[in-house]
């Protein structure tokens, strides 16, 4: 059991996860070393609204001035992370919640001054993750990081990709509410960068699936060998521990 698997759950998924998801994590843990990264968008938006702070996004990234970063940190590292950890442990999965600040786990480079405290992963302190896993814990990571002793928000997909690349993970699994990429009603089991561009251009990939495949492509560029897009409501593992959904790799045809 030497290979790593990184699982990313978006914030909109966390309240909807059922027993099937947790059973799948148990299966994966029997075969691999598992790390989970989560988002928290809906809960952050709700808390910002409560605080009368406007929500603004540019190119899919949350504009994060200091007052927004304070809320992001409070939600991601607090209620969202701890509720997810407790849910995992309720299903007999031993988990430890961490943020990217803990142990300098995630170091970042700022994206741009215009969007404030938003960073991209530049370094991952993998020893912390490996230590937790060696003690039989599942690390559950809230995607914030540090730069020059300041705290930055990180897109959860970007954080998961950075962690997967740093661990030389066998696979990055993106949890969604659909079976994967669908073409004429049928599941696309395998695809690659060039075919994804074609499918987007033809309108096969639309709406909420576009950010998922863009995250997959970004992960490939960072060195992750395989990305799976799977449905949270179905058993997305085979008996072997392999994922069932859409697999994105380099140079693989969907035909």
From Swiss-Prot:
Task: Tell me what organism the protein belongs to.
Answer: Bacillus anthracis (strain CDC 684 / NRRL 3495)
Q: Where in or outside the cell is it found? A: Cytoplasm
Q: What is this protein called?
A: Acetylglutamate kinase
Record keyword Ligase present:
no
Which pathway does this chain act in? Answer: Amino-acid biosynthesis; L-arginine biosynthesis; N(2)-acetyl-L-ornithine from L-glutamate: step 2/4
Q: What is its EC number?
A: 2.7.2.8
Q: Where does substrate bind?
A: 40-41, 62, 153
Report keywords, A-Z.
Answer: Amino-acid biosynthesis, Arginine biosynthesis, ATP-binding, Cytoplasm, Kinase, Nucleotide-binding, Transferase
């Amino acid at each position: 059991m030497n290979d790593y698997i990184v699982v990313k759950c978006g914030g909109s998924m966390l309240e909807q996860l059922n027993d099937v998801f947790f059973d799948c994590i148990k299966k994966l843990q029997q075969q691999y070393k598992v790390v989970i990264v989560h988002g928290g968008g809906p809960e952050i938006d709700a808390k910002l609204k409560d605080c009368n702070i406007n929500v603004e996004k540019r190119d899919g990234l949350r504009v994060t001035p200091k007052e927004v970063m304070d809320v992001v940190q409070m939600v991601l590292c607090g209620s969202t992370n701890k509720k997810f950890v407790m849910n995992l442990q309720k299903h007999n999965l031993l988990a430890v919640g961490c943020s990217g600040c803990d142990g300098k786990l995630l170091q970042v480079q700022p994206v741009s001054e215009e969007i404030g405290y938003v960073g991209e992963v530049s370094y991952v302190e993998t020893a912390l993750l490996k230590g937790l896993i060696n003690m039989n814990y599942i690390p559950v990571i809230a995607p914030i990081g540090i730069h020059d002793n300041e705290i930055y928000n990180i897109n959860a997909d970007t954080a998961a990709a950075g962690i997967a690349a740093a661990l030389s993970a066998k696979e990055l699994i993106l949890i969604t509410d659909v079976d994967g990429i669908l073409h004429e009603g049928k599941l696309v089991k395998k695809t690659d960068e060039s075919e994804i561009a074609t499918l987007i251009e033809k309108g096969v990939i639309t709406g909420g699936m576009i950010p998922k495949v863009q995250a997959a492509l970004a992960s490939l560029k960072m060195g992750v060998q395989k990305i799976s897009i799977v449905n949270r409501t179905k058993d997305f593992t085979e008996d072997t521990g392999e994922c069932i959904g859409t697999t994105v790799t380099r140079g693989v045809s969907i035909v």
